[in-house]
Amino acid sequence: MKLVRYGAPGAEKPAVIAMNGDGTEHAYDLSPVTDDITGEFLAADGLAAAKRALDAGDLPTVELDGQRLGAPIARPSAIICVGMNYAEHAAESGSAPPTVPIIFFKTPNTVAGPDDEAFIPRNSTKTDWEVELGVVIGKRASYLESPEQAAGHIAGYLTANDLSERTFQIEDSGGQWSKGKCAPGFSPLGPWLVPAENVDANNLRLRSWVNGEPRQDSTTADMIFPVDFLVHHLSQYLTMEPGDVILTGTPQGVALSGKYPYLKAGDIVEIEIEGLGRQRQAFAQA
């Protein structure tokens, strides 16, 4: 089961994609269950309600071909990001691997659909890509007792691109990275939200391409701090609400390494995470 939101920006409708007995996938309208895929929906055990309706045959089919897909979670109250969570990415950035998670934030209005047009910010010369595993919180998480308990607060997972402007992030930052992370549309999410029970978050292949040429190719098994640890750790410092998104870091292979040019108008970035779907952004100048 994969949850999606489709339609024009700000007017997305909920749907669910499921495998039929004949081995083919079909999309079903989820509006009999919920108006949207929100934190409130997740907190009310919405994933279980969606599965019950799907299994009962209560959902009409819907055609998604030709439809714009939005981010599969609406209006997260927070986007919490983990920096340098892959040792080789830390090395290519000129940093030692962290001994505790490095945390920064992106503003919620950076969220975009997986294939929406993306923009090089004004005055940018170093716009970069970052394929990342996104974690969507399903239950309020505060002062959790263990990583094992933290696992029960995760609704599901999605593909994310933590777009970044490196001059804004580093030279202009004053030590805080968010300046380089919060340009409009800098958090494409999706295409799907896959329930946590269907995902082995510790062994997923992540890849990215620019203009069809490979850039990143790694696995979440290489994360320094795994997902359950991160959710538990973060809960000791802040309260995560249902629908909030954690971006868990990116592997090596970004332009910051010096091995590849930064993005420019006309470039095409594609990212993919095993089982969670593929994104495609065409870049224009803001």
Short names for language-model regions:
Residues 102-121, 141-142, 185-192, 251-255, ...:
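Short catalytic-site patches enriched in acidic/histidine residues
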Residues 109, 113-166:
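Non-heme Fe(II) oxygenase catalytic core, chiefly the N-lobe of the double-stranded beta-helix
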Residues 74, 81, 128-130, 241, ...:
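Residue-level recognition of short, solvent-exposed, well-ordered loop/turn junctions
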Residues 97-114, 127-129, 265-275:
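Structural signature of FAD isoalloxazine-binding scaffolds in flavoprotein oxidoreductases
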Residues 61-68, 87-89, 97-98, 112-123, ...:
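Short acidic (Asp/Glu) patches
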Residues 5-10, 62, 68, 89, ...:
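Catalytic-pocket segment enriched in acidic/His residues
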